[in-house]
Design a protein with these regions (language model features):
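Positively charged, low-complexity intrinsically disordered leader regions
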Residues: 6-71, 75, 143
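Anion-binding alpha/beta catalytic cores of soluble intermediary-metabolism enzymes, centered on
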Residues: 2, 105-107, 112-183, 279
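Adenosine-phosphate binding glycine-rich loop
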Residues: 274-275, 280-321
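Active-site cofactor/substrate anionic-group-binding motifs, chiefly glycine-
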Residues: 57-110
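Rossmann-like adenosine-cofactor binding region
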Residues: 210-292
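Short, structured coil segments at secondary-structure junctions
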Residues: 80, 110, 130-131, 187, ...
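Glycine-rich phosphate/diphosphate-binding loop of Rossmann-like nucleotide-binding domains
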Residues: 63-76, 157-239
Length: 321
């Protein structure tokens, strides 16, 4: 079989599919998305046009504030030649009690896809249930698959491959952490999540990851020991201690509980000498990481932020019919 025939076969698997969680995608499919993102990144660097979705329309429904997700998606959609329509629930009849199933079916008649950033994973799934066009999860409280793709692309660029790489994660055990656990289990990375006792990953996420890890050879370790997590890590990943949409009333308690888990220069020095520092942003200097670390030579944070656009572009180009 010719290479282009094989590529065509896997490409056909994407058309019309939703992108709700990385759990719905195989190792081969995720790798194909990452390769597609790299192709788009190279085209953009060379100023080569890639308007694969010219004439398409995409709705963007955001219930949460956003900097990177909104800007990266709108830029990606523009580069692909499509039009995007940004909405909040307050600007729609959702604010007056219109059911999701009605809103979903109306959007479906106007647009070729929906990008949604919301709270409950169940909302994303309900839109997907009532829409024929693809639905993209741009963040829920449970998962953040678009961030997961950007993280994997960044690690692959900086480290050459994914399998066997050790990620030390320190921060809130929330959507980004869940997607990193899922990605690691599928792609064969080793992830060590360091957190205070009592802050544990979602049971459904862990059950999936443990089953996948048996096949991929990944190590999924949840620990209270930051030093063992960071030791010999290829990637040191910090995240906020009080995630957006999380229990804000617990903010002060979380700051106290997570204080021993700050990534500073001393902690980063315990990782491999060529380890990279990552953070999904927004970041709080002086809490989960120091200014010295995020602004230091090992920081890959800005490349990581840029890669949101390239990976989102790949997803949209692959799934929008």
């Amino acid at each position: 079989m010719k290479k282009e025939d094989g590529e065509g076969n896997i490409r056909m698997k994407f058309k019309g599919r939703d992108f709700l969680t990385l759990m719905d995608y195989t190792n081969e499919e995720i790798d194909f998305i990452l390769n597609t993102a790299t192709d788009f990144k190279n085209k953009l660097a060379k100023r080569e046009p890639h308007e694969q979705l010219r004439g398409r329309t995409l709705a963007m429904l955001f219930e949460k504030p956003s900097t990177r997700t909104r800007t990266s998606f709108q830029a990606a959609i523009a580069h692909l030649g499509a039009q995007s329509f940004y909405m909040t629930p307050q600007q729609t009849q959702l604010s007056r009690g219109e059911p999701i199933k009605d809103t979903a079916r109306v959007i479906d008649r106007y647009c070729d896809g929906l990008v949604i950033r919301t709270f409950e994973q169940e909302k994303v799934e309900e839109y997907a249930k009532y829409m024929e066009s693809p639905v993209v999860n741009a963040l829920t409280d449970l998962t953040h698959p678009c961030q997961g793709l950007a993280d994997m692309l960044t690690i692959k660029e900086k480290k050459g491959s994914l399998k066997g790489k050790k990620i030390a994660y320190a921060g809130d055990v929330w959507n980004v952490c869940h997607s990193l656990i899922i990605a690691s289990s599928i792609m064969g990375m080793n992830i060590y999540v360091a957190r205070p006792k009592g802050y544990d990953p979602n049971e459904k996420i862990m059950k999936f990851a443990e089953e996948k890890a048996e096949k991929s050879g990944a190590e999924i370790v949840i620990t209270t020991d930051l030093h063992s997590a960071v030791k010999d890590a290829d990637v040191v990943y910090a995240n906020t201690w009080h995630s957006m949409g999380g229990p804000e009333k617990e903010k002060e308690k979380r700051i106290r509980d997570f204080k021993p888990y700050q990534i500073n220069a001393n902690i980063l020095s315990e990782a491999k000498k060529d380890a990279i520092f990552m953070h999904c942003l927004p970041g709080y200097r002086g809490e989960e990481m120091t200014d010295e670390v995020i602004e230091g030579p090992q920081s890959a944070v800005w490349d990581q932020a840029e890669n949101r656009m390239h990976t989102e572009k790949a997803v949209l180009a692959l799934i929008i019919p």
